[in-house]
Amino acid sequence: MGCTTEFNKWEGITYDAANKKLYTAISSVEGAMENSHPSNDKGTENRIRVGKNSCGCVMEMVLDYKFSPFRSRMLTCGIPNTDPLTKAVDACVTDHIANPDNVAMISRFNQLIIGEDTVTGHQNDLIWIFDLPTGAMTRIASTPYGSETTSPYWFTVGDWDYMSYVIQHPYGESDQAMLIEAANSGICVFFCWIVVVEMQVVCALGELRVHI
């Protein structure tokens, strides 16, 4: 048995049974994951040697016959924003992920759901569909100010496909000044469903607010 303590901000994980792979979110690639900071590798064997990426990545891990990962790579990563006009609002470019937090496999379509939990990476946290064969990314949802996406899940009932996800603590962790109606604040959790038939979104059901 072996392990490493070098991972930083390791978040959600999902299993791809068809391809025998794991996909996992690394919210911020830095610290002991880097190869250029020996002080961060004290007490380790420096097995992870990648460049820093504060926008984070989704990692792919290939499993052996014992279901142990033996090879890994960064599947897709966020890209730091260098545009002086927009980087103060979105520290990561908006056509790629920022600080991924949750992942979920869509086995039927060989696609991956990626949900963000970012403060400075994107002004509004996003949910993406990543197409594994082509690498194409499609942004399918965004959240209110100050909230994060969580708990994305895809399930099939009969001929219908459903995706559910949660919008957590709107206006709660940041951007409180943007709040207009108190009822829309972080005291609520927003549950949302997207209904898909034959790869097409045919309707988006309304929000269900549950006060906590």
Give residue spans per PLM region.
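Sequence/structural signature of beta-propeller domains
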Residues: M1-I212
